[in-house]
């Protein structure tokens, strides 16, 4: 019987080639789109779940009352790890992680750049990064021990055994390779190419004991069977015991496996995070697949009259409804199987471009039995979902009516078909509106005034002898006409690396724990960056040696500190008094989507990490770059000149939203294509079923235009209804998404009008092809048997 079902199903697919092509193509595209999204979702939800002890691993977080609301963050002071290990026996191990900028690594005459982390020796014991060479308990057990990833080791040493080899880091210290670790998987929050033991930090006197300096990430691993709720309760008083400046701050543990997706807090409560995007695209995947299945349902029911006699005869000879349903479901599963093969081909072809778009390394794991099981289940579910309604409908025909030729599509068939078309285009219109709004939000942020001049502004990290030779480099850049101004800062102008809630000033409320961004800068800071000075002056150590104790503050800081005359005020920070010499206009330091925070810029003598260079715009960019390269090579010969243009770095702030916008655009386009395929097939069958009516109308003088109008108007009504339903749904969804951005665009009426008009035009073009074809047909052929 099964063999017979398969033969019948195959014959039906071959007999109706156009029907089969539209269904297989539409379902294949829908399945491919859903598979791509599901691959991405699987990657997102699997973050940090490969660790053997994942259920016992936690990040250490802080919770504090800031301006009446609870703020949460995962930056911790360096001494906290030792305090936790000492005071809480329920915690088995603790590890700190400090991030490093890309550092130059020298092996013989060869130079490389690598991204690393400074970690406690317990790091490899807590987290599942297997060692290919070396011992987990000894690899990170010395001041100059270094563990390399397999990829970096092969890049530097080729096929040689790297163990015990000496490498020079940042042209300052020699390290001994003590281990080779597997490359961190793509679903790990830890991205590194080498690991250095925390003992190096202590040796360099950087392991400061200050509880006010929240500069590292701390991780804890509980002992088996330890009760989390009990530990959480005890941790609340940790700061009270050790932190004399902020004893009211609370400490708590946050599951490592949740940090990637859920690490967003509002007023001390976990409110989501990246999981919101994951859920959104999960819904998109489901709807794309449903839309593809709707095509199958519509086309199958549309050609029901063609198969009515088959059903009638089979029922007369004894076929049961159950066996007919099984046959029709078998046909849809067979079609889904072919569509699934097409989907796999599409996914394989699209994956490289898709990975580039989302900045991932996703792949189909054909060696995994789980993959094939999931694929089979996916195809089976798609086939059953697509074929369930047509199977039930076709199997319900009454043989007497069918064999008398009395079967006509009434409301029982037409109404569900209309609902399905409306559903398709409702979702398509929602996606079109969402795509436009996302792009508007990105454009809104891009158009926001940064407050400084990005053009011709270059920065370079101070590595090697740059800081030592800073004055010589600066003078030569200016003398050569390459630059018009040069300054050094603690961080790039596009980033905020430090903040504090412990600053003091006259009139400050003791309960005020406002977080203030901290920045350090040198002479010509304002001139180089193009910031606007509201009052006072720029740093000028040459004419004002006391500027090493001077500070600039922004307008938001003036409001926060309630200064009526800010210039001359004294601010205490980092155990030092700073005299305000000027006020700068607010500028975007961090996210362009967020409000500008109060900012304090210290004219310190130390803490410099970056040199900013304002290039001479009278020279060609290539000439300026060549000149800078030669000057830096002269004074810092052991390092490559790795410069960055500020405008390009600032543009990277929009990458996530741009990626979301591109994905929304892509899947909106696919949704429209799938919907139009179904509409094309449906209009073809509608024209075929009304061919005699069209013939009569043409004989009576109807024009091609009137025929097109006749066949198109019903579809256009459905699109209009879909637009009416989609508009409030899209408004609600996008308003909810935009609520996460304090600096956001408005949702304009013309977005909805444009999306609706686009949907109508696309549908009209799709239907018109078949309508024009029917309108231009010869009525004699349609009426010759009448």
Residue ranges and their predicted role:
Residues 13-16, 23, 44, 60, ...:
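Generic structural signal for small/hydrophobic residues in well-ordered secondary structure
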Residues 292-334, 678-716, 770, 777-778:
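Interfacial "coupling" helices/loops that link adjacent transmembrane helices in transporter permeases
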Residues 32, 36-39, 252, 333-399, ...:
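Small-residue-rich transmembrane alpha-helices
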Residues 1-21, 268-270, 300-337, 341, ...:
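Alpha-helical transmembrane segments of integral membrane proteins
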Residues 15-42, 273-309, 337, 416-438, ...:
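Hydrophobic alpha-helical transmembrane segments of multi-pass inner-membrane transport and secretion
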Residues 2-11, 15, 51-52, 226, ...:
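Membrane-helix entry/capping segments
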Residues 38-102, 211-221, 232-234, 250-261, ...:
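Membrane-proximal extracellular/periplasmic loop immediately following the first transmembrane helix
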């Amino acid at each position: 019987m099964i063999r017979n079902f398969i033969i019948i199903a195959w014959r039906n697919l071959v007999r109706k080639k156009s029907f089969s092509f539209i269904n297989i193509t539409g379902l294949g595209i829908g399945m491919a789109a859903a598979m791509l999204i599901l691959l991405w979702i699987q990657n997102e939800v699997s973050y940090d779940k490969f660790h053997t002890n994942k259920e016992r691993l936690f990040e250490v977080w802080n919770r504090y009352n800031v301006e009446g609301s609870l703020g949460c963050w995962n930056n911790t002071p360096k001494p906290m790890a030792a305090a936790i290990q000492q005071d809480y026996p329920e915690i088995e191990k603790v590890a700190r992680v400090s991030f490093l900028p890309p550092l130059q690594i020298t092996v013989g005459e060869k130079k490389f750049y690598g991204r690393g982390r400074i970690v406690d020796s317990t790091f490899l014991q807590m987290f599942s990064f297997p060692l290919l060479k070396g011992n987990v308990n000894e690899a990170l057990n010395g001041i100059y021990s270094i563990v390399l990833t397999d990829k970096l080791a092969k890049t530097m040493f080729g096929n040689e055994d790297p163990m015990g080899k000496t490498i020079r880091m940042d042209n300052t210290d020699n390290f001994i390779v003590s281990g080779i670790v597997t490359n961190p998987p793509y679903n790990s929050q830890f991205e590194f190419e080498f690991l250095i033991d925390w003992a190096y930090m202590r040796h360099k006197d950087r392991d400061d004991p200050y509880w006010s300096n929240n500069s590292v990430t701390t991780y804890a691993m509980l002992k088996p069977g330890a009760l989390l709720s009990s530990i959480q309760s005890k941790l609340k008083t940790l700061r009270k015991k050790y932190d004399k400046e902020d004893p009211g701050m609370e400490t708590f543990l946050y599951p490592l496996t949740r940090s990637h997706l859920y690490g967003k807090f509002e007023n001390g409560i976990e409110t989501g995070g990246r999981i919101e995007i994951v859920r959104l695209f999960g819904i998109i995947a489901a709807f794309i697949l449903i839309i593809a299945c709707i095509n199958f349902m519509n086309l199958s029911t549309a050609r029901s009259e063609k198969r009515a006699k088959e059903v009638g005869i089979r029922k007369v000879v004894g076929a049961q409804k159950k066996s007919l349903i099984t046959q029709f479901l078998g046909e849809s599963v067979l079609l889904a199987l072919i569509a699934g093969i097409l989907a796999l081909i599409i996914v394989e072809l699209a994956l490289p471009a898709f990975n580039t778009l989302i900045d991932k390394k996703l792949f189909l794991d054909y060696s995994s039995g789980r993959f094939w099981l999931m694929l089979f289940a996916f195809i089976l579910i798609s086939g059953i979902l697509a074929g369930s309604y047509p199977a039930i409908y076709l199997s319900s025909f009454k043989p007497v009516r069918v064999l008398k030729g009395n079967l006509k599509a009434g409301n029982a068939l037409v109404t569900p078909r209309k609902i399905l078309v409306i559903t398709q285009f409702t979702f398509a219109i929602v996606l079109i509106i969402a795509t436009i709004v996302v792009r508007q939000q990105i454009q809104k942020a891009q158009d926001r005034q940064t407050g400084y001049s990005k053009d011709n502004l270059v920065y370079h990290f101070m590595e090697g002898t740059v800081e030592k030779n800073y004055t010589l480099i600066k003078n030569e850049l200016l003398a050569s006409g390459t630059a018009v101004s040069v300054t050094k800062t603690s961080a790039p102008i596009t980033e905020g690396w430090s903040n504090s809630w412990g600053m003091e000033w006259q009139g400050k409320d003791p309960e005020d724990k406002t977080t203030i961004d901290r920045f350090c800068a040198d002479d010509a800071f304002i001139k180089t960056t193009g910031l606007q000075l509201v009052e006072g002056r720029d740093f000028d150590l040459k004419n004002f040696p006391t500027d090493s104790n001077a500070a600039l503050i922004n307008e938001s800081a003036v409001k926060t500190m309630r200064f009526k005359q800010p210039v001359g005020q004294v601010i205490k920070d980092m155990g030092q008094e700073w005299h305000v010499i000027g006020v700068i206009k607010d500028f975007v330091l961090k996210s362009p989507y967020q409000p500008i925070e109060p900012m304090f810029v210290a004219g310190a003598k130390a803490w410099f990490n970056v040199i900013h260079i304002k290039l001479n715009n009278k020279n060609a960019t290539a000439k300026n770059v060549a000149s800078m390269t030669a000057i830096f090579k002269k004074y810092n010969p052991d390092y490559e000149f790795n410069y960055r243009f500020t405008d390009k770095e600032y543009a990277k702030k929009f990458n996530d939203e741009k990626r979301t916008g591109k994905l929304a655009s892509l899947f909106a386009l696919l949704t429209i294509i799938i919907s139009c395929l179904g509409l094309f097939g449906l209009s073809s069958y509608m024209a075929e079923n009304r061919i005699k009516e069209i013939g009569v109308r043409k004989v009576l003088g109807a024009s091609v235009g009137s025929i097109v109008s006749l066949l198109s108007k019903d579809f256009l009504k459905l699109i209009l209804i879909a637009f009416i339903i989609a508009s409030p749904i899209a408004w609600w969804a996008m308003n909810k998404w935009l609520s996460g951005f304090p600096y956001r665009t408005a949702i304009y009426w013309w977005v909805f009008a444009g999306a609706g008009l686009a949907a109508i035009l696309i549908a009209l073009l799709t239907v018109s092809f078949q309508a024009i074809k029917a309108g231009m047909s010869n009525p004699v052929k349609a009426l010759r048997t009448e």
